[in-house]
Amino acid sequence: MTLQKPFPDRPLTLAVLGSSGAVGAEILKILEERSFPIRELRLLASERSAGQVQFFKGEDLVVKKVSPEGFEDVDLVLASAGGSISRKWRKVINSAGAVIVDNSNAYRMEPDVPLVVPEVNPSQVFTHKGLIANPNCTTILLALVLAPLSAQLPIKRVVVSTYQSASGAGARAMNELKQLSQDVLNGNIPKSEILPYSLAFNLFLHNSPLQSNNYCEEEMKMINETRKILNQSELAITATCVRVPVLRAHSESINIEFAEPFPVEEARKILSNASGIKLLEDIQMNRFPMPIDVTGKDDIAVGRIRQDLSNPKALELWLCGDQIRKGAALNAIQIAELLLTRS
């Protein structure tokens, strides 16, 4: 099924699938902040979350159990309920005539599904066949930096290490980090139930499943999705992903090798003018981006841009970005806003 018809020239009937999760709740906040044109908003989730009340534009809205009836006459579905739910309901949603912006990893690497970061490859939105995939959070942050730099000089290789907050594992993981940190301070042994190990005053390699190549699933997402977004299938890129005891916002240490030497000041200028990026560098005070700088913010923060002393063609830099906002909810809504431009 190909769904490339423009949206109606009126406010949309919009469904948020998975509205009760951390990303779903953030979607509601951002829809209101950006005055997204909504005629009717439907909140859909699992049976466990049905009956919950969420707040939107001064009104209490009741979350309903996801069902085929919930998608009748819907124009757009923002889905953040996980890959299995997206796969289960895609055909039903598209058959009802709605377009899906999907936050899960279910369809990201499907050849005919656009994988979009609006600041990087916006035209891909209009190639959709009923579903547009939202990239992984760490991939979005990385792509925002790589795209404007690669427009200046070809990139030969990327080495990235991530420092991923509890928010990447959802609201329950954030609450667990708070509780286990208090347990440690009280002299008790922390017992993790949501994450595989205690994150309180601790860090561990990302807990997604290991693949046959000994990279974890999260690392392979970054590698494969970045290649697809930048349309560089042979890009040399490697990643190491780590979960750290931060509540919200991810960080990344990035080494980028170019085809030729890239002057540091030129890179600073390009990134400072790039959409979605705030340059944060106070060299005198040794002050660079931190997760608290970007928590609740739309833009990512980039700094510590410097020459790689071991490679004259490489630069080092550091970034922080809110995983729930630009890494998920905001990016999905920006995709929806692009779709509106074809109305």
Swiss-Prot record:
GO terms, molecular function: aspartate-semialdehyde dehydrogenase activity; NAD binding; NADP binding; protein dimerization activity
Residues given in the record as substrate binding sites: 164, 243
Entry-linked InterPro entries: Asp_semialdehyde_DH, Asp_semialdehyde_DH_beta, NAD(P)-bd_dom_sf, Semialdehyde_DH_NAD-bd, Semialdhyde_DH_dimer_dom
Residues the record lists as binding phosphate: 108, 221
Known catalytic reactions: L-aspartate 4-semialdehyde + phosphate + NADP(+) = 4-phospho-L-aspartate + NADPH + H(+)
Enzyme active site: 137, 250
Entry-linked PANTHER family: ASPARTATE-SEMIALDEHYDE DEHYDROGENASE (PTHR46278:SF2), DEHYDROGENASE, PUTATIVE-RELATED (PTHR46278)
Protein family: Belongs to the aspartate-semialdehyde dehydrogenase family.
HAMAP family, per the entry: ASADH
Protein task: Catalyzes the NADPH-dependent formation of L-aspartate-semialdehyde (L-ASA) by the reductive dephosphorylation of L-aspartyl-4-phosphate.
Name the record gives this protein: Aspartate-semialdehyde dehydrogenase
Designated gene of the protein: asd
